[in-house]
Amino acid sequence: MKHKRRFICRMICALALSAPLVVKAQSEQSFVLDTLHLPGTMNVVEPELLKKGVVNNALDALNGQTAGVNVTSNGLDRMAMLNSVRVRGTTSIMGGNDPLVIIDGVTSDVATLATIYPADIESFTVLKNASETALYGSRGASGVIQVKTKKGTGRGFQISYEGNCGLEAMCKSMEMLNAAEYIAAAQKLGLEYNDKGYNTNFRKAITRTGQVQNHYLAFSGGTPHSNYRASFGYIDHNTIIRSKGYRNLVAKIDVTQKAFGDRLTGDFGVFGSSFKNNDIFDNQMLFYSADAMNPTYPYDRVNGSWLKNGSASQINPPGALLVERNDTKNMNFNAHLKLSYDISKDLSVSGFGAYSYASNENDQFCPTWVWAQGNLYRGEFKSEEWLANVQANYQHVWGIHDLKAMAGAEYQKDVRSGFWTSAKGITNNDMGYHNIGVAASRPFGGTDSNYEDPSLASVMAGADYTLLGRYAVSVSVRGDGSSMVGDDHTWGFFPSLSLSWNMKREKWLRHIDDITMLKLRTGYGRSGNLGGISSYTTMNTVRQNGIVSINSSPTVTMGMIRNNNPDLKWETRSTWNIGADVGLWNNRLVMTAEYYYSKTTDMLYAYDVPVPPFAYDKLLANIGSMSNQGLEIGFSVTPVQKKDMELNINMNLAWQKNKLLSLSGEYEGMQMSAADVTAMGGLSGAGQHGGYNNVVYQIVGQPLGVFYLPHCKGLVVVGNGHYRYDIEDLDRNGTVDLSDGGDRYIAGQATPKVTLGSNVSFRYRDWYLSLQMNGAFGHKIFDGTGLAYNNMSSFPDYNVLKGAPEKNIVDQNVSDYWLENGDYLNIEYLTVGYDVPIKKGVVKSLRLSLSVNNLATITGYSGLTPMINSYVVNSTMGIDDKRTYPVYRTYSMGLSIQF
């Protein structure tokens, strides 16, 4: 393998510059287009760019690799507990913002993708333009991620192993008062305090050196006519927080068989995973308690009991909180079979079938020393999916004409069910959640179940015509019929049209050797979104409302929970894009740029309606609209390319602007509109000691998720050396009003305006170095942690940050005082490796590596970390609300060997 390590120089916006690319319908039955003729942008992330030190999650492998794709995973904002991906921004308020995931032709989701073992992934292909996603119809509005896993090569028997072991060390945490500082501050301020005689750093007490190990073993063999591949992966991660960790076991088998003179090809695959996560019941309570606990208290039990400060009702002894449990077990299974038959040189047909099963178990336990009566919860959720697809593909070249076409049909059926129960009144904490019968009471509504069985039928067709090898037009249409929309809108149709011009093949440019590629492209298409609709959204539905006595027997009463809306239909996203791709000097320098504008219409929103005439006070209707526009720029350069040395630099930049256009319109002759200003997120949970707490808002005419805050002119003395925030009377009416409609102004947005991803790879003989950097700019973060931890009105019952006693602020109302720039540049990983020279023998290649993940973050943000949830629209968006999970760095060693 000496000198043969190939550094991928793919464009992060990228074109696979020489290989053909596949435009795939939902089951990968497809027609092949030459990349240079492709009117849209398909972003391919190849295997070399997925090697990022310790990668515990396939989503982490994708982060920063392609422009306009933002990944929020548990590895970034651990307190938000998100596994989400946004492709070119948020497109809906009610849901369906995660992209459609296709794993080896099987429809899936981001949660399942997170369980795929990273080393099993051959490549990611991200589809962003509607001219590409229209083939996915009602589920393509938020983009599509195609995942291709590794298959047999047909080169005889091979064995490969990849392993990685690492340690996690805390590198940054909240600096709270120690015992001596705590006592000195209380005495200086003349406050009564409890002194138990200890000096405890509770943050260090609940943490440890984290350990992570990944092991991956793969077998493959056979011939080009009959081959197989089997792989097994295992991840064991004991996190930096005591008692928290997870394990993921993955197994996968793929078999390919050809027959009848290679005219028939059969592909069969089986995938299974088991993911077990051990967590605690209330993470925010744990971290706030560890920070705010009186440092003179002990960490361990005293005489068999936890020592608790009765005056601090919002915290508990951190050691007691670590006994809580919130455990999950996710099981996934999939089997799929694809048969393809070449009827002639130009015509082929294929059939694809898949079955998927998933189960999720969630078990929770909260002991009586945390909650007076304790709490138990057990839930089990299952889903099954059947998918069938048939397709015909035609391809013919005659003279200067090249035509590729496809037509197909698809049917998908899902069945989802769940059951859960909760109880309290625990008499014995030793059994945890394993014996729910020891609990004395079952709260009303704590036991429930659900069931839904949506189905989707589809027809699709597409064609690609190329003239003279340089002028290309591509058209497609897909029709989806869903059981979840209203009867009058069962079918939705999603067309697309795109054009491209390969200028390099023009006579006047063909002989200019310095220009390897020059292409212009544009396209328009429509795609749909069903994410905001459930199986029974179009119907009047009821649920249990209470218990009354009828004839001396307890009887459950029922009440309305939803108005029916037979006019519910798809949200529709229309996108127009125009772009250019340039390659110079044999593609040692590749540049790409694309502008896009998309508009979501018929956007779903839950409107307030009068009762009567409606039976319920909310109505879900298709009335709103939202836009996204942006510019994506990328380049890939190879400044050094020699036998013993090579340097590649890849970079992508994305500018993105979102705007909530309208939430007003008519429904059956009735004018409907949402409130001008609606709170989306605020400070909550442990550590919120009163005050106005709404921070992030939804405002028509603004980006979704803006900071709408009072303006603080500074601090003002209020007596006894205390300070409060000096809030400006913005409307000049003589009264400061902190409510949602009061003295507030739009102070910035939570979503970054610009994102950056960059990868640098360098090889010198058998040594190599790889560096990944990601960044986000142009957004704000509200430091709710700083607000809470500097609030001296709760001291000394609750500990505070170093420096807080000197500021002596006794105010917890929100304002722009705690709003900061969220810009950052993070060095995600640095890897140094060595390819051991192998001359002869059983071993074909051997690679050793050392990696550091989360090497450094350059930022002006004063909080713990700027890498919080800045993309997913929920109550945590843009808010650092006591999300004080320690920042840690991972040091790891890797081994890769092939036989």
Regions found by a protein language model. Give the residues of each.
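Conserved small-residue
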Residues: 160-195, 420-422, 621, 638-748, ...
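Glycine-rich, aromatic-lined ligand/substrate-binding cores of catalytic
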Residues: 749-781
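C-terminal beta-barrel architecture of Gram-negative outer-membrane proteins
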Residues: 734-735, 768-828
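Acidic, glycine-rich flexible loop segments
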Residues: 284-319
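Short aromatic-centered micro-motifs
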Residues: 101, 300, 465, 706, ...
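Extracellular/periplasmic, surface-exposed regions of secreted and cell-surface proteins
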Residues: 98, 210-213, 248, 254-260, ...
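Short, small/polar-rich motifs associated with maturation and membrane association
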Residues: 1-259, 264-273, 318, 332-334, ...
